Amino acid sequence: KFEPTRPMQGIGAHMIGIVTAQELRENLGDVFVSGRTCTEWIDFSISAIERLFLKPELEALLEVVGPNGELIDHHDGRTLNPGHAIECAWFIMHEGVRRKDSRLVSLGLTILDWMWERGWDEE
């Protein structure tokens, strides 16, 4: 849902979508939920994260973006949450290991490396 004042979307629904679908698939099989299999929901969410929230030019996974993945010039749009991003990276890596998909593992590792660096306090 977007509000007309400051249209934006958060990464949370996609990352929770991944882990929820992983758990459903693990316990119930690759069942259909709202017209998609669990694996299709995982693919949908990983694709959205990669397309909208991953910003290689910033070496960051953003918490909030505009409706089409654009940067938001407001404090909401500049929020980084390394812990959240690292959790997201774990879900993507877990899926990559399950599928033996080195591209997904690499994507997760890239997110982990970028956000670990951003979140680490040298002091």
Report the location of each language-model feature.
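Glycan-recognition and catalytic cores of secretory/periplasmic carbohydrate-active enzymes
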Residues: 1-123
